């Protein structure tokens, strides 16, 4: 399912309304959009990614100075959160993240130490796992155990679509062959369905689904 936007960030810039000011405004808009588009901000609780949504231009007179006009623009970025979650006593989401972290040279959000401000380049692949849904399992519960079915979304992000797609293929093949991965208590998570859609956005939606 598509996630909601977690918030927005707006940057306002303005220059004196003349030929040089207008040129400076156009250049500043390009620089700021490039600087913040696709940037990740991380603290101890969550990671946020910024995605440019729109730029709105304006022209107005400075209050109290009727002969001074400025031209400017407001750049709006959507913020998507990648928060830490813990699903105890059995954490399928964290266990899949750990499995990925241990088997591939990728950056796993909330499983890897990250800088406060960073942006994946063409060589780096970034992965985030989250719980999409949970239902009672198809097997009947017993006194020894209770079964649940989890849908886990995997977000795969990179500056290179080729590298992101290659990792997705490797991940799907690995899980398809193993048919399981180890949970945090040592028990297996049995995978019964894998899905990959190129129509889904890796930041908003997560284009890989692991069901089991």
Give, region by region, the residue ranges found by the protein language model.
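A short glycine-rich, His/Asp/Glu-containing loop-to-beta-strand
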Residues: 125-128
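Charged, amphipathic alpha-helical segments and their flanking helix caps
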Residues: 2-121, 132-212
